[in-house]
Amino acid sequence: MKTQWSEILTPLLLLLLGLLHVSWAQSSCTGSPGIPGVPGIPGVPGSDGKPGTPGIKGEKGLPGLAGDHGELGEKGDAGIPGIPGKVGPKGPVGPKGAPGPPGPRGPKGGSGDYKATQKVAFSALRTVNSALRPNQAIRFEKVITNVNDNYEPRSGKFTCKVPGLYYFTYHASSRGNLCVNIVRGRDRDRMQKVLTFCDYAQNTFQVTTGGVVLKLEQEEVVHLQATDKNSLLGVEGANSIFTGFLLFPDMDV
């Protein structure tokens, strides 16, 4: 404590002596300036001053060094679907696939046209050897086949029940000249000659044959007709036969 007071009193005494010296010097007209006193001790720091005005914005600094890569973040949500792209080129044909399973059974079909399944056919022999008059219908009285009974053996005439295309043919044995007509028409009307087959031979056996396709209407009649040159035979070993059958029914009727 004594030391602190001595440190304080010493400078004060020196200051007092200086003041006395100055006062004496001022009272003397010819005194010289005294020696400068010892500097005083620093004063107590003052309080903080008011904040200054903001300074002018400085220039942009240089870019800093690149920082280290951060850790990988979590996967984000899916984005909105983009606009569909253009259609690409057609690809190559792929390999043939395996057969698929059988499909379900289809519905039952409708009833078919009875005409499409209609069957008409006949074959008949002539077994009598009697003479024939010109324009007379030639009877083939022994029936071999007569499906649907459209051929009448007692008259030798075929009557159409199913309109359509028919084929008629005959094989006739004779000894001498033979001419045979194939005729058609309504049985009640005048018959029309379609064609004539002739074969001329004297005193010798021969076989004459002919055939034709006819489009017939319902109830139209077809038969073979004798002429004035007729040596037709109907005996064992020299048979004559008349045949006809339906090729195609007329579906429009």
UniProtKB/Swiss-Prot annotation:
**Keyword Glycoprotein tagged:** yes
Q: Which residues carry this modification: 5-hydroxylysine?
A: K57, K60, K75, K90, K96, K108
User: Which GO molecular function annotation, any one, does this entry have?
Assistant: identical protein binding
Q: How is it modified after translation?
A: Hydroxylated on lysine and proline residues. Hydroxylated lysine residues can be glycosylated. Human C1Q contains up to 68.3 hydroxylysine-galactosylglucose residues and up to 2.5 hydroxylysine-galactose per molecule. Total percentage hydroxylysine residues glycosylated is 86.4%.
- Cysteines paired by S-S bonds: C179-C198
Domain (C1q) ranges = 115-253
Q: What residues bear Pyrrolidone carboxylic acid in this entry?
A: Q26
Q: Where is the protein found, in the record's own terms?
A: Secreted; Cell surface
* Chain residues that bind Ca(2+): D199, Y200, Q206
State which tissues express it. Highest levels in spleen, lung and brain. Weaker expression in kidney and liver. In the spleen, localized mainly to the red pulp, in cells mainly of monocyte-macrophage lineage. In white pulp, localized in specific dendritic cells such as those from the periarteriolar lymphatic sheath (PALS).
Question: InterPro entries given for it?
Answer: C1q_dom (IPR001073), Collagen (IPR008160), Collagen/C1q_domain (IPR050392), Tumour_necrosis_fac-like_dom (IPR008983)
4-hydroxyproline: which positions carry it? P33, P36, P39, P51, P54, P63, P81, P84, P99, P102
Q: What is its main location?
A: secreted
Any domain commentary? The C1q domain is the ligand-recognition domain, which specifically recognizes and binds the Fc regions of IgG or IgM immunoglobulins. The collagen-like domain interacts with C1R and C1S proenzymes.
- Protein's name in the database: Complement C1q subcomponent subunit B
Q: Which organism is it from?
A: Rattus norvegicus (Rat)
Traced from the root, the source organism's taxonomic lineage reads: Eukaryota, Metazoa, Chordata, Craniata, Vertebrata
The gene it comes from is C1qb
